[in-house]
Amino acid sequence: MYAQAYFDYDSKKSGGVTMSHLRFGKKAIKSTYLIKQANFVACHNPSYVRKYNMVQELVPGGTFLLNCSWSPEELETHLPGQVKRYIAENDIQFYTIDGIKIGKEIGLGGRINTVLQSAFFKLAAIIPEETAIELMKAAAKATYGKKGDKIVQMNYDAIAVSYTHLRAHETDQYL
């Protein structure tokens, strides 16, 4: 498996917008341009769904993951009409996860990186699930090992819990 990553940051050091352009393939990737049509788009900050037109960059049949606490009824209110319409008309697979709630319950506070990373690997299915879990756990151990076993375990918990807290949403009602 080959991967290519390009990250586009705004001028804020913390709390700003980051667009991650990731490519995966069985052959070496030598593309020098940003992704214009994606198979997967995630929005980690629910306020961005009104600010930025993210779903328009999804190919038909692509996957959109929104990190939010909204119920299906609240989604109806919070999602802009053009977002709902694009999702429905283009057969977008739409999922939500409440990363903040998961992080707080596990003890990670507002840190959602492991939660959303786990959700990405589950939904994108670019490598087998068991392999993804093993690799994420190894990365958590390498990244947080010096902070202690408790922090490592909280990240292991985030990996496991994220898989079960993804919510798929029917989108026919958006037509």
Regions found by a protein language model. Give the residues of each.
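Active-site cofactor/cluster-binding pocket
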Residues: 1-167
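Single conserved hydrophobic/aromatic residue that forms the stacking wall/gate
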Residues: 165, 172-175
